[in-house]
């Protein structure tokens, strides 16, 4: 059902009933696997499917994600190397493979799950390059107009991936900044076009899911303490 529709019958968002936890040995083993193998194994674990690395490579191509070194020890992950030049196409083609070619939904948990699998694949590339390990966490930065990847990073970190801070970058529109620092979020504001159009949206995609996940995590931490 989660691959066929974005929301449940009651309008709520789908979340995993049981969250997998990857051991340190499993994380260390990522460097021995290809990007496609990492993606296949994570999706199989989440959806109880039997994808192979060849299934993933046939769907998304040999190099669907490329890492570009920038100054200040920054690495850009380009997730748009596909015929449509968008990350959404990567999500669509993998979700379609999981559904066996049947029509369905590409948003919601399906998109979050693909994002998690892609992050595991990227961290496998990092490990092979000696960039990261368990004692050396990597911060992730994304623009604030779309919270699908921050949501995926949140789950991936909780499941064992060595992710440090998850940074959501705002521009001068600053609606998200007001929400985080002042507890206010206005939906009647007018966005000013900038050089970062994805951050110009008034309400970022999947912001509600990210807030819910954050609150659940804070509540769990308070119970532990």
PLM region spans:
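PLP-dependent amino-acid enzyme catalytic core
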Residues: 1-225
């Amino acid at each position: 059902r989660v691959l066929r529709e974005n929301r449940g019958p009651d309008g709520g968002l789908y979340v995993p009933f049981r969250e997998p936890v990857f051991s340190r040995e499993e994380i260390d083993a990522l460097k021995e696997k290809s990007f496609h193998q990492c993606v296949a194994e994570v999706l199989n674990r989440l959806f109880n499917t039997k994808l192979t690395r060849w299934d993933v490579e046939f769907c998304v191509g040999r190099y669907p994600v490329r890492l570009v070194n920038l100054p200040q020890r920054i690495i850009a992950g380009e997730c748009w190397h596909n015929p449509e030049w968008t990350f959404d196409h990567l999500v669509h083609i993998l979700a379609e493979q999981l559904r066996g070619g049947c029509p369905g939904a590409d948003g919601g948990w399906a998109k979050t799950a693909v994002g998690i699998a892609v992050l595991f694949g990227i961290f496998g590339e990092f490990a092979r390059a000696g960039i990261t390990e368990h004692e050396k966490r990597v911060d992730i930065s994304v623009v604030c107009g779309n919270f699908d990847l921050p949501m995926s990073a949140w789950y991936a970190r909780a499941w064992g991936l060595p992710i440090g801070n998850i940074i959501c970058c705002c521009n001068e529109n600053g609606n998200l900044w007001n929400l985080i620092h002042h507890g206010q979020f206005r939906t009647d504001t007018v966005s000013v076009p900038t050089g970062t159009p994805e951050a110009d949206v008034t309400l970022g995609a999947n912001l509600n899911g990210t807030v819910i996940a954050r609150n659940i995590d804070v509540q769990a931490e308070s119970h532990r303490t």
